[in-house]
Amino acid sequence: MLEVETAFIIHSTNYDQIFNVIDQLIISEGYIAKKNGIQIIHDTYFDTKDEILKKNEIALRIREIDEQVTKITLKKLKNTTKNYSERIEIEDTYTKEMLNQIILKINSYLNLNIFNDHLKYYNIDPKLTLKNLGFKIIQTRQTKRKIVNAISKSCNHTAFEFVFDTTTYNFDKNKNVTNIELEIELKLSNNIAVLDNFVRKLKINQPLVKFWPYNKLLTGKVIEMLLYKDELKENKDYDEKKILTLSGLEKIELFIKSKSIKKN
């Protein structure tokens, strides 16, 4: 499936204020805002030893939701615009069949056959399976996710999913850092113009949020690098609760942009 989404960093811990802003935004476009619960998510990302997935803009993830459901996910960047990104996504509950599908897709993307006889490594523990296949863990994080759906009045289906993520990136030596993010995901493909409009309104009218066109995997890797270079300073770039400040976000974005310029 094609995942179309955008993201903003939230500058406030006043959730009532943020929820009210999003409620009004949803209503202004003719949708019904409906809260859809809270999830606790644990994500673990993997790559090969030589990081071949990263080099090909592919992400491999194991996601545990509320300690009840475990999903395996593969994403590959397809396209980016000024307001959103498009990724090809394969995601489902972790099973032998899903593992097979994802490994075959990785081989297809890379035009390689580097994982032969992969099913013989299958284990009910997905992380152990991927390690046995030669993958390494490159990032772990925990997210508290609050979900608000934008419901279409005409068909009563979810047109957009708004999620408020409080995400803590876990690094060695207890160097954990948190950011608060709003993601908007398109659920009905004929509403792309409305997604653009949501983004435009938030960019222009909302000082509480900062447009953030960088995925969590990249954001976390840059945070990790800056922490170990001692370039993110406590009480300046992150507060006493380890939540990133605007100063910290600007350092992260500057680093990403500088690397992008060099690459181009």
Residue ranges and their predicted role:
Residues 1-264:
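Phosphate-end processing signature that detects enzymes handling 5′-triphosphorylated RNA
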